[in-house]
Structure formats: C-alpha cells, structure tokens
Amino acid sequence: MKSWVFVLGLSLFSPEPIQSGPTERSFEMIEPRQLLNHVVRPTLAQLEIDGDTAEKLVMGTIAHESKLGTYLKQIQGPALGICQMEPPTHDDIWHNWLRYRPAMTEQLLKFVPMWAMEGKTEPDARLLITSLEYAVAMCRIHY
C-alpha cells in the first residue's frame, strides 16, 4: 500500500512530478522526494530507527520548520538546520540523553565529520546547518 503525505500542498510520495510555477512569494526548497530518498530514509535506516511513521515525522518537521530546507537558520531566532533545532536543545540531547545511550551515540557519530570532533566530546550545534544527515538524525532522536 502506497503512503501519501501532503506537505505544503505537495505529495511527497506522488509518482507525478511536482509542478512549480511563479508565485507572488516564491522561495526555493529542496525537492521533497529527493530529500526523502537521498537523505531522510538512508539516515533513519542507518540509525535503525526508521519506518514510515518516522519518515513522515521528520519530513513534516522539515516542511513546517524550514519550508523544506528554505531556511538553514531561523530568521529572528536561534534555531539551526533544516529541522530548526535550537542549540540548547541540541546540547541537552547530548548531555542528558545520548551520554546514557552509547550505542545510539556511536550510530549518530557516523554522521559527524572527524574535523567537527577535534578536541571535543560532542559536535557543535552549528553542524545542524552544514550536515543534512546530522540534522535529520538529531531531529529523529529528539522525537
């Protein structure tokens, strides 16, 4: 059975191409199926906390919070990345949740480049902006 998710008026699982045209207020976004197939689904599978519900949750968050990747930093606020996670939330997950779950921490660190960990015990929240996979992984862990 095919699943359908409608986000910003777009069907994420539709076999038809999404048509876009000029609008009064246009913005650029990441094409939803590409984001799902090339970032969200593989990231969740590698974390081993995947599935249809998890995909919908993360894609819905991305659609709502950043308009499908239009914004990598909240315009008048601290939230970062395609899932718009605030740095204190990021840090709290590392300090109060991941530190007690070494297996999940090990999985998450696969999305963190080595340079981001030099001399640190956890990555800086700014990695949420530069790594789509890391942002998706942190979003899923947050839920």
For each of these PLM feature ranges, what is it?
Residues P15-E16:
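C-terminal segment of classical bacterial N-terminal signal peptides
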